Amino acid sequence: MQLSQIKLSKLILIFLLFFVASAQLSNAQETDILDFLPAILAAAALNTDNDVVVPLNQFNIGDSIGEGEAADGTIGEAHHETVWSTGYNASDTVYSLNERFENSDALSYYENNDARDPDLNHAISGAVMADFAVQATEIVATASSSTPSGTAGMVTILLGNNDVCAPSLDTMTNPVLFEEHYRAGLDVLANSAATSSSSIHVSSIPAIYWLWNAKYTNFKCRLIIWPFVPCENLLDNPSDDCANSVSRLEPDTIYQGDGTNCIRRKTFHARIRDIYNPILRDVLQEYRDDNKLSNAYFIDIFDVQFGDSHVNNGDCFHPSEAGHALLSGEEWCRAQWGLDDLTCAP
C-alpha cells in the first residue's frame, strides 16, 4: 500500500527540518546535533492534518446491506467484498471504510480480505434488531480468539431495515421491542472486555423511501420484481399517486391531493425518522453518558438520497456498487474521520 498523502506530508516536513539542522551544523562548529533533536522529534509527533485514527481491526453487524446483497444485480447473491464498511475489492469503486483504514495505516490495521471476512463480517441477510445480540456475541468470541489484539478495534452496525420493512404499517416491529433488542445487543458489547472499549459505529436506518423513488418508473421493477420484495408497506401499489412531483420529492410533507399509497409511503418514511432512528440515537447516547460504551457514535444518514444508479437493477431494491460507494463516503465523512478530510464536502 502507498503511504497516504497525510503521512507523506509529515515525512517531508521531518526531512526538511533534518536538512535545515544539518546545514546549520555544517556552519556552526560548536553546535551539537542534540540541540536540534527536540525540533525533529516534535515534527515526528506533529499531526499536520489530524491523521486518521485507525482502529486495530473492523467487525461488521448487519443485514442484507451488510452482505452486499445483489450489489452487482444478481438477485439473492451476497457480495461481501463490495460492502460499504468491511468491503475489500480493490478493483471496485466503493472505497470501503476497511480500504480507507488500510490506506491510512497498513502496518497497524488488520484489514479485512477474502480469507478473514468470515471472522470479521457477521451480517446476515434478513437480520432484524432481535439478531443484534446474536451477531454481537459472535463478534466477542471471534475477536477474542481470531485477531492479533484479542479485541475488536471497531464495530460497524447497520440494522433495522427489516424491522421497518413489513407487510403493512401495522406490522412494523413494535418500537418497545425494537428498543429492547437494541439494548440487548449493546449490552453484549458493553459487557465484554473484547468490545467494551471498541469504537462502536451505529448507523441510522437510511431513508428507504428513496429506493422506491429511484426505480418506481422502471416497468420490470414495479410489476415483476417488487411483488416479491418483503417491504410491502413501501412497495405495494408502487405507481406514483402523490399530488405532483414536488410532493413526491418531499416525503417529509403530506400535500393536499396526495393519494393513499403516497400517504402510506410518507408515513413509513416518517416512522423511521420520528420513532426508530431516535431510539438508535438516544439509547446509544445513554450508553455513552453512562460510560458503558464511551467510544460509541451514532451516524445519521437519513438525509442521504439514493438515485437510480445507487440501486441495483436485479432486485431493484438493495444498494448497487455505486450505492455502497455512496454509503461509504457518507458514513466516513459524517464520522470523526471526515472532520479534517478535505475530500468531504462541508
Predicted segment positions?
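Catalytic His-Asp segment of secreted/periplasmic serine-dependent ester chemistry enzymes
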Residues: 210-346
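A short helix->loop->beta-strand "cap" motif at the edges of active sites that frequently abuts
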Residues: 194-198
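Structural recognition of the beta-strand scaffold that forms the well-ordered cores
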Residues: 57-69, 118-123, 153-159, 163-165, ...
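Structured segments of extracytoplasmic/periplasmic soluble domains
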Residues: 64-67, 100-107, 135-146, 185-193, ...
